From Swiss-Prot:
Gene from which the chain derives: drm
Protein name as annotated: Protein drumstick
GO MF: DNA binding; zinc ion binding
Residues in the signal sequence: none
Annotated localization: Nucleus
Keyword annotations from UniProtKB, A to Z: Developmental protein, DNA-binding, Metal-binding, Nucleus, Pair-rule protein, Repeat, Transcription, Transcription regulation, Zinc, Zinc-finger
């Protein structure tokens, strides 16, 4: 069993949230954005290195810098016929 701790004080609540937030140890060398995982940093840094590489949607013609964004767009926006 475990107990649930109730925090009534606003100062304590914000302090608790700050301590429970994961540390952002991986920093982008281009814009100083912080990440908790090295993989996320690597994906982000690609946007700085190669802006000329784009992926386009065959249905609507929109362009995306990341392949994952195109895949997400296909699933949620465009209707495949």
């Amino acid at each position: 069993m475990f107990a649930v701790m109730r925090i009534d004080n606003d100062d304590c609540r914000s302090d608790f949230r700050r301590k429970m937030r994961p540390k952002c140890e991986f920093i982008c060398k281009y814009c100083q954005r912080r990440f908790t995982k090295p993989y996320n940093l690597m994906i982000h840094e690609r946007t700085h290195k190669s802006p000329e590489i784009t992926y386009s949607c065959e249905v609507c013609g929109k362009y995306f810098k990341q392949r994952d964004n195109l895949r997400q767009h296909r699933c949620s926006q465009c209707v495949w016929r």
